[in-house]
UniProtKB/Swiss-Prot annotation:
Annotated membrane topology: Multi-pass membrane protein
Matches recorded under PROSITE patterns: CYTB_CTER, CYTB_NTER
One GO location term (cellular component): respiratory chain complex III
Cofactor(s) recorded in Swiss-Prot or TrEMBL: heme b
Family: Belongs to the cytochrome b family.
Protein name, entry field: Cytochrome b
Pfam families in the cross-refs: Cytochrom_B_C (PF00032), Cytochrome_B (PF00033)
Membrane-crossing residue ranges in chain numbering: 33-53, 77-98, 113-133, 178-198, 226-246, 288-308, 320-340, 347-367
Job description of the protein: Component of the ubiquinol-cytochrome c reductase complex (complex III or cytochrome b-c1 complex) that is part of the mitochondrial respiratory chain. The b-c1 complex mediates electron transfer from ubiquinol to cytochrome c. Contributes to the generation of a proton gradient across the mitochondrial membrane that is then used for ATP synthesis.
């Protein structure tokens, strides 16, 4: 008789995704980040739920409610630190996951890739509205600066900003709706993750060689389920270590000051995981141009499958494109550094060069290198 996990309508779905899933035998630790992102999402939803039980989304009490969570709620300080630093780990995993996809040609599964880009945008949006909730100085001014970018939209810009704010400035209405968005979006992300997985399981996973692995498949459980568990353990140890030893390492000191609309912080900057995009935004002197560059810096990922020119899938056997890939990684790191620097010489010009290089690599250098390698190989 067939086992229940193979016949039960619900268990069958879980079985096909987590137990009897055929996986390539040679996938490396770079294929662990999908499951780690699932763990991050679960941890964020769980800690966020407990924070929401004690948080108040009103400008008079928001800041002190966070202080109350840290001081008076049992293990509130731990839940808050896990949630704040969990966001950083979420983005570390997401960037490594995207980097893996770019390196090994996973983007050729177009549906999976495009759903992934939408997921990235949703996660970025969730992190942004979440950063506003503690109602510190950087929360308030970050919200003011970033939402103000919508005013660059021709004709309807100002109306759009006031509609988003719910008034003529970032105020109580803004905080309340941002809390609503921050509560809702993770569940939409969870649903989109399911769609991401459905598309992935239509084709199966890629592998480090970039070759067809149909002849050499092994079951997901126990081989990769245990490998994933090791990843879970390492991620949780790192997260708990950060949350316990240096919980404010990645935060901004300005956020220890309650929001004050009358005092602007000397350097307004987002959390570290948005700095590369912020640097691209700032590197263009025109407001609308900057906003478009900011949007395109993420949406350019959707063009990667279209711009794939090589006959080979992965970069494993493509030394020229490998160099460009690592140049891109270095460039994103430089942009991240520049995004956290004041707008003055020499940071302005470095940011502009790095921004131009970022788009040039994606739109011109990678496709050209692919064509050149085709010539070399034939």
């Amino acid at each position: 008789m067939a086992s229940l996990r193979k016949t039960h309508p619900l268990l069958k779905i879980a079985n096909d995704a987590l137990v009897d899933l055929p996986a390539p035998s040679n996938i490396s630790v770079w294929w662990n980040f999908g499951s780690l992102l699932g763990l991050c999402l679960a941890a964020q939803i769980l800690t966020g739920l407990f924070l929401a039980m004690h948080y108040t989304s009103d400008i008079t009490t928001a800041f002190s409610s966070v202080a109350h969570i840290c001081r008076d709620v049992n293990y509130g300080w731990l839940i808050r630190n896990m949630h704040a630093n969990g966001a950083s780990f979420f983005f570390i995993c997401i960037y490594l996951h995207i980097g893996r996809g770019l390196y090994y040609g996973s983007y050729l599964y177009k549906e999976t890739w495009n759903v992934g880009v939408v997921l990235l945008l949703l996660v970025m949006m969730t992190a942004f509205v979440g950063y506003v909730l503690p109602w510190g100085q950087m929360s308030f001014w970050g919200a003011t600066v970033i939402t103000n970018l919508l005013s660059a939209v021709p004709y309807i810009g100002n109306s759009l900003v006031q509609w988003l704010w719910g008034g003529f400035s970032v105020d109580n209405a803004t905080l309340t709706r941002f809390f609503a968005f921050h509560f809702l979006l993770p569940f939409i992300i969870a649903a989109m993750t399911m769609i991401h997985l459905i598309f992935l399981h239509e084709t199966g996973s890629t592998n480090p060689a970039g070759l067809n692995s149909d002849a050499e498949k092994i079951s997901f459980h126990p081989y990769f389920s245990y490998e994933d568990l090791l990843g879970f353990a390492m991620l949780l140890v790192a997260l708990i270590a950060l949350a316990l030893f240096t919980p404010n390492l990645l935060g901004d000191p300005d956020n220890f000051t309650p929001a004050n609309p009358l005092v602007t912080p000397p350097h307004i900057k987002p959390e570290w995981y948005f700095l590369f995009a912020y640097a691209i935004l700032r590197s263009i002197p025109n407001k609308l141009g900057g906003v478009l560059a900011l949007l395109f810096s993420i949406l350019i990922l959707m063009l990667v499958p279209i711009l794939h020119t090589s006959k080979l899938r992965a970069l494993t056997f493509r030394p020229l494109t490998q160099c460009l890939f690592w140049l891109l990684v270095a460039d994103v790191m430089i942009l991240t550094w520049i995004g956290g620097m004041p707008v003055e010489h020499p940071f302005i010009i470095i940011g502009q060069i790095a921004s131009i290089l970022y788009f040039t690599i994606f739109l011109f250098l990678l496709p050209t290198a692919g064509l050149a390698e085709n010539k070399i190989f034939t």
